[in-house]
């Protein structure tokens, strides 16, 4: 139980018993933590900041990767951005699942110093590859540049050089 020393002393000097329950124990603490996060988001205008930085990140991704022959789509909202990888950009045919693209991209991204979320099975549970990017709300412009460069390094290492 979390409480102030004053509350604890009242219980201790009373019956010594604190009988309570919830259908989902621990929820008050989780709710208090969530409330603190919401206050931080509002007081520091982080939602607006996320939208602004997200637009910048989206533009950077479009500029860097939109003409890549293996990029089928780039989209997102705020700082939550995704890139779909395909065998052919025009037909949007998925990469062969046997290539294990997401696994290789994750390894290459990690080696480049980038933590991201590549996954396969985007289309039907087996076919389709993508990477999700979700940098923190407090990311700076220089770090956005670094993120895109590291992602480019990882994609190039995974798929090979492109023009």
Whereabouts are the PLM-identified features?
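Conserved N-terminal phosphate-binding loop of PLP-dependent enzymes in the Aspartate aminotransferase
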Residues: 1-163
């Amino acid at each position: 139980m979390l409480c102030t020393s004053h509350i604890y002393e009242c219980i201790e000097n009373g019956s010594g018993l604190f009988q309570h329950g919830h259908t989902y124990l621990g929820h008050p603490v989780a709710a208090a933590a969530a409330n603190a996060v919401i206050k931080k988001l509002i007081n520091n205008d982080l939602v607006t900041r996320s939208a602004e930085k997200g637009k910048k990140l989206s533009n950077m991704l479009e500029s860097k990767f939109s003409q890549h022959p293996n990029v089928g789509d780039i989209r997102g909202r705020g700082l939550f951005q995704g890139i779909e990888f395909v065998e052919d950009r025009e037909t949007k045919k998925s990469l062969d699942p046997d290539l294990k693209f997401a696994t290789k991209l994750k390894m290459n991204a990690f080696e480049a110093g980038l933590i991201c979320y590549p996954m396969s099975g985007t289309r039907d549970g087996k076919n389709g590859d993508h990477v999700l990017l979700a940098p923190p709300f407090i990311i700076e412009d220089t770090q956005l540049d670094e993120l895109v460069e590291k992602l480019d390094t990882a994609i190039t290492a995974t798929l090979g050089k492109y023009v």
